[in-house]
Every structure is written in structure tokens, then in C-alpha cells.
Amino acid sequence: EITMYGADWCGDCRRSKRLLEELDVQITHIDVEADESAAAKVVEINGGAKSIPVIVFPDGTHMTEPSDNDLKAKLVALGVVSA
């Protein structure tokens, strides 16, 4: 399962979410504005930074503010989508 921590006002979050939808990738979206524990988790994952989106993958790795190309490459590497 892929989890994305983000917020509605965040342009990079909307861009990443749109790419995931276009690729038909199912995600769990967690709004850090509505969930204080999720906001704390983002800071923990990022080593103190509040940067979003943070996308956590099934293999335990994560990406923070990825470009569309980097995000798609990661999904291909994980076998979630084809190249």
C-alpha cells in the first residue's frame, strides 16, 4: 500500500496525486492539516522538515516532494506500473 501525506493547499501534493490517479495507482491520502499525528509523522520521516508531499511505499522507502519523472520511475522500479 502506498500512503501519501499532503494537504489540499499544496501544489506539489496535487501534482503528485494527479499523476498517481492518471497511472491508476491506489493510495491512502492523509491530510496533515486535519491530522496532527500525521503532521508529526511527516516531520519524523523527513528528519525534522515539514516538507510535503511525503509518499511512503510498500518497501518502506519514501520520497519527499518528488518530481513526476522520479515518482513514476520509483513506481516502475517497484513493479506498481509498467514503463
Describe the role of every protein-language-model region.
Residues 11, 37, 50, 70:
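Short alpha-helical
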Residues 25-39:
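Thiol-based oxidoreductase modules, predominantly thioredoxin-like and allied folds used
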Residues 40-46, 75:
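Short amphipathic alpha-helix with an adjacent loop that forms part of the alpha/beta core around
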Residues 1-25:
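Local sequence-structure signature of Cys/Sec-based thiol-disulfide redox active-site neighborhoods
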Residues 46-55:
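Structural micro-motif
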Residues 14-17, 39, 68:
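Conserved strand-to-helix beginnings and helix N-cap segments that scaffold or border functional pockets
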Residues 57-83:
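Non-catalytic, surface beta->alpha helical segment in thiol-disulfide oxidoreductase systems
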